[in-house]
C-alpha cells in the first residue's frame, strides 16, 4: 500500500543519463512525497547513452514511486540537447499545472525546500512583482536577515519554483529583440546594473540558433518585467559539482578558483517553521552586490585575478588541455567567433 502524499505541490524533474546524481535528487523528492511528479528525460545521443538512460528510468519507475502521486512522463526518443530541452520541459509542466517546483538531476534539495516553495507559491501566487522562488543562496547563510527570506533581482536556477503566469510571459522566439523601445530600455538596465556585457549579444546568438535557451529567455523576462525573486535566508540546495558530464559546467574541482569552488562545496540547510515573512517587498541590495562580486560581474580586476588563479591551478596540476582550450576560446572571442568565452 502506497503512502499518502505529504505536500500538495508539483515537482518537475529533469534528468538524462547520470543515475548516480539522479538517485540523490530523487531520494530527496521521495522523502518529500509531492502530490504530482513531472519526469522529463532527453533522448540518447547514441548507444553510449542508453545504459545511463535506462538506469535513470528505473530509478523513476512506478515501483519506486511508493506514495500516492499523479505522475506525468515525457521521455524523448530523439536527443534535443540541454537547450531546448529545459525550455520544452518547463513549458510542458506549466501547461498542465499553475505552479511547480523545478529540479535538475544535479540539484539536491534540503527537505525544507519543498514546504518553503509551497508556502511561497501560495502566498505570492497573484503578486506580479514576484517571478520565481530560488533555493540556492550564494551567501549560504545571509547575514543580518531577520526574516526567513528576502527579495532580490539576482537568482540561480539550481532548484527553483514559479507560476504559469510567469512562464506564459517567456518569449521563446526572442520577440523582445525586435522591439526597439524595449531594447533601448533593456540596454540601459544592463548597463546601469553592471550586468554581464554580453547578455544582449548572447540573446541574439540564441535567437539566431533557432533554439530556445530558457536561461536567457527567463532572465530577459525578469528584466523586462522588473521582476524579483524570493531568496531563502539559508541555502537549501547542493549542486553536485563540477565534472565532465555536468549540464552547465565542466572541469575539475581542484582547478576551479576558490570563490567558485566554494559554491560547489556549500552546505545546504533547513529552515525553521513557521516562516517569518518580510513586511515589505524591497530588494536586498547588499545581497545583490555580494553576488556580483562572487561572480565578478562589473568587477574586472576580480575577474582577471580569477583567470590568473585558474591558470596557476591548471599549471600546478598539469592540466594543459584546459589551458589550450581557454586560449582557443580567447582567440575566437578576439576574432569575433565566440562572443561569450
Residue ranges and their predicted role:
Residues 1-102, 107-341:
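An acidic/histidine-cluster motif and surrounding catalytic segment
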